[in-house]
Amino acid sequence: PEAIEVLTLARQMSELTSGKFDVTFGALSDVWKFDHDQDDSIPSQAQIAARLPLIDYRRLVVDAQAGTAFLQTKGMRAHLGGIGKGYAVDRAVKMMRDAGLKDFSVQAGGDLYVAGKRGDRPWRLGIADPRAANGSIFARIELSDSTFSTSGDYERAFVKDGVRYHHILDPRTGAPAGLGQPAWPWAVAVLARGGALADGLSTAAMVAGPRAAAALRRRASNRFTGDSTQRLLAYASVRWLCA
C-alpha cells in the first residue's frame, strides 16, 4: 500500500508541476553518477538524448484501487528521489501523532518537520549559505507544525573545468538544472504542511528557476487550499529561492 501511495503522490506532483518534477527521471539515473558510483564523468549528448524519450510521467499508470502501477514503455524507470524522503517524513509524523506526541521533530535528509515547541520556545531553524566553506547561517526562521524542505546544487555534486554539476536533473534536458546559467538559484527552500508536498515542490522549483517558481507556488496553493503556510521569498545575497 505504501508503494502505491507514494507513486500516486509522485504522479500527482509530476502533473502539478507540468513535469518540472517527473517521477520517471529514473531513466537518467545510470547516465549521471552522483551517488556511490560518482566518478565525475559527464555523459555525452548522445547518451542523454537516448534516454529523454523514456521520461514522461504521463506513461506511469497507477491504479490505487487495484494496487498496481506500471510504466507503458520498455526502458522507463520510476525514481522517488525528490519526493521519497518527504513522504517518509509524513509517515513518521503520523506515527508520532498517533502515539500522542505533540512536540517533536523528524528529519530525513533535507526534509525537516517540526511540531509544537522546543521546550518553552518555538523551533528555530538556521538556513545555511550554500557556498560558505564554514556552513555559516545567513537567515533564521521560526516555525511549528510544518515541513521545511531544501534542494540545492551543493550536495551530491562536483565541479569540473569550472562548471558545477549536481544531482537535480531537468527532466526536459537531461542535464543538471540551470547548467551554464549564472542567474540560477543555488538552492531552494519550501515551507509547507506536508513533507511530500514540500519535497516535490523544492525539487520542481530548482528545475523551474526563479521566474517559474512563483507560478508553481500559486498552482500548489490553489490545489492545496489548506496549506496556507506557503510563501515565496528571494534571498538574492546567496541566491537562495525560498518558496
Model features per residue range: what roles?
Residues 1-243:
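Mature catalytic core of soluble alpha/beta enzymes
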